Amino acid sequence: MNLTDTVATILAILALTAGTGVFVAAEFSLTALDRSTVEANARGGTSRDRFIQRAHHRLSFQLSGAQLGISITTLATGYLTEPLVAELPHPGLVAVGMSDRVADGLITFFALVIVTSLSMVFGELVPKYLAVARPLRTARSVVAGQVLFSLLLTPAIRLTNGAANWIVRRLGIEPAEELRSARTPQELVSLVRSSARSGALDDATAWLMRRSLQFGALTAEELMTPRSKIVALQTDDTIADLVAAAAASGFSRFPVVEGDLDATVGIVHVKQVFEVPPGDRAHTLLTTVAEPVAVVPSTLDGDAVMAQVRASALQTAMVVDEYGGTAGMVTLEDLIEEIVGDVRDEHDDATPDVVAAGNGWRVSGLLRIDEVASATGYRAPDGPYETISGLVLRELGHIPVAGETVELTALDQDGLPDDSMRWLATVIQMDGRRIDLLELIKMGGHADPGSGRGR
């Protein structure tokens, strides 16, 4: 090989390495770009942006074209490198007593390592990092050439795509032609947490976004005020009784029932008092002002509950269980508080649901298990209960009295029983047969000898 051929071969290798870089940059920039960004730029951008949009609409096809281009340029680089390496002089190796065969093998090895390393760095790694760091700018530079290459080699790309899809189907998997751009709520929650840890989102914003995304996974049963906490009025009660009930309970909405909550005929709001002249309130029945009330099943998801509650006259719905009995009531305030946290007004109890107390926490028995976990760090095992009082009742096996204590099993971050950490629950206050207030204490290892189950 003369000098001219050698120079031409080196230039060809450099050009092929650059070609590999173009295909790698096109592949990574197209996968890094978000669909919404591509569409927005195509509407108000240049012809290059419309090329990017065209490529993004056939992403699987373009990625296959990029892979084919990478394979062709890499193979061509190896093909040109081999005769060039064979011509490399090695008199120094022969001079030290090394045979021609060993010298040829050694020089070929080192030459291939150098060429391969340069090709990997400049043909693959550098373009990849550029594309990931600046996907839009990179795509504008390389995608037009990528689209043209894929157009010219369409038959070959379709052939390789068809063969690959056939093999994947034989493995029992249906090939996906495009990358999935949508994300599940769980994936979005994970992204929010990662963004908060990296400092891209402040903690308050991340907390609000996380609760908003998790809202749809909750059910009406988890969102409602339970039946035992509802104050109802009878059909023969009057507006004056509504005033008295509002003053005594601090509530603003009341179901109107015939006998009990399983026969709810409507809903009234304390603001409706002002629709009736003061002199008529003592003998105006609630049924004359009651509004129809929406009814939702206890298994309905949070988003659907929100839609029905917002559409109802007084933004309230009754929740029924699988047997048709009333399980509770859900209001718009309940739903908003699930997203933004407690919204307290002058009628609410000033005592918060969770209060730090010494080495533990005093918590309302009505708190859900996930709310307890968020507030205290205690993660309960799965079971047939929704609230912390339900868990304690299950562990005790009977209706407790104030002062009873039970040891609770905790789960670790992976959802496995954590034998290194135990929790002690003490009943502080009962409301009839319902646990109204509990104290949770975190203990290391096992409970002390004076504590136990059902003491």
Curated annotation (Swiss-Prot):
PROSITE patterns (UniProt xref): CBS, CNNM
Localization annotation: Cell membrane
Main location (coarse class): membrane
Source taxon at top rank: Bacteria
Database matches in Pfam families: CBS, CNNM, CorC_HlyC
SUPFAM superfamilies linked: CBS-domain pair, FAD-binding/transporter-associated domain-like
Transmembrane segments: 6-26, 68-88, 106-126, 148-168
Topology of this chain in the membrane: Multi-pass membrane protein
GO molecular function, one term: flavin adenine dinucleotide binding
Statement: the UniProt record of this protein carries the keyword Transferase: no
Record-level GO cellular component terms: plasma membrane
CDD domains, sorted: CBS_pair_CorC_HlyC_assoc
Cysteine disulfide links: none
Family from the record: Belongs to the UPF0053 family.
Protein name: UPF0053 protein MT1890
